[in-house]
């Protein structure tokens, strides 16, 4: 039914006999007149592994807590509700989907999405990627422990980019010690005012992050006023902080040892470009970084 823009309703029992179906990817994508779906639509489809983009671009405003409860073989739950109308989802929506490996762009660009329950991903221990998870939503806050049981995640790229969050809990990434990238994770969070010093260190991903894991990390966070000491401590393999604070127009102070342990860094391209409130750089902020070759921008 992809792009069926005149479809207004999904009838009860539509897939009751689709017991051998393995995927419903893109099934109702861009059916922008659909505002609701039967709670038991997929109850008999116990073999499906993918629901990627299932309701992307629809006008669904709520989803039943048990909607995916019988789809225990699901692995791909990416882009399900992107470009939609949801404001939130039930905490136990994915409680029975223990094999899911990707939630990429789950709510991306759903501007109405405002809140996420703390236990939404509590029963999804196999997840590998949350790339662009909430990107472009109106998410206002991040509950503590949101990723507490997702220790296999490698990708948080752009996960919270362009959201309305004002702060993040110190334990947000705690225990996620297989992360390879945080790139652009908070890019464009224009209301983000502060970040805790333990934010990245609590993950323990010191040996798994890629060389460019922090590029664009706080780019265009226009309300961020300060950076805590020790924020990047321990990440000795990182070689670039390109655009890390580019466009942080409210940033006024930096800790002297911000990059003290990042001794492999070679590039700081545009790292403080557009930081119009930053009047001075503390002595020694770049001390000991003998491998740096680029300060352009």
Where are these regions (language model features)?
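Solvent-exposed loop and capping/linker segments of extracellular ligand-binding repeat ectodomains
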Residues: 1-297
């Amino acid at each position: 039914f992809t792009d069926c823009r005149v479809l207004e309703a999904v009838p009860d029992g539509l897939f009751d006999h689709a017991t051998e179906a393995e995927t419903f990817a893109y099934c109702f994508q861009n059916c922008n007149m659909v505002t609701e779906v039967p709670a038991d639509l997929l109850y008999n489809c116990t073999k499906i592994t993918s629901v990627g983009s299932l309701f992307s671009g629809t006008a669904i405003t709520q989803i039943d807590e048990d909607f995916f409860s019988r789809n225990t073989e699901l692995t791909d739950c990416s882009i399900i509700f992107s470009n939609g109308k949801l404001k939130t989802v039930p905490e136990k929506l994915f409680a029975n989907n223990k094999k899911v490996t990707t939630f990429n762009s789950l709510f991306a660009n759903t501007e109405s999405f405002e809140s996420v329950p703390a236990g939404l991903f509590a029963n999804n221990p196999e997840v590998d990627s949350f790339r662009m998870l909430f990107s472009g939503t109106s998410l206002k806050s991040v509950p503590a422990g949101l990723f507490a049981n997702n220790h296999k995640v490698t990708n948080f790229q752009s996960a919270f980019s362009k959201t309305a969050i004002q702060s993040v809990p110190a334990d947000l990434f705690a225990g996620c010690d297989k992360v390879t990238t945080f790139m652009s994770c908070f890019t464009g969070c224009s209301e983000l005012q502060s970040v805790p010093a333990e934010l990245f260190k609590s993950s323990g991903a010191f040996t798994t992050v890629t060389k460019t894991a922090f590029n664009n990390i706080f780019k265009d966070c226009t309300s961020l006023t300060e950076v805590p000491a020790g924020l990047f401590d321990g990440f000795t393999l990182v070689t670039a902080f390109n655009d890390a604070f580019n466009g942080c127009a409210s940033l006024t102070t930096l800790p002297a040892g911000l990059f003290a342990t990042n001794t492999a860094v070679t590039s700081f391209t545009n790292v403080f470009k557009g930081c119009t409130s930053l009047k001075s750089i503390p002595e020694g902020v770049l001390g000991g970084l003998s491998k740096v070759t680029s300060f352009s921008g």
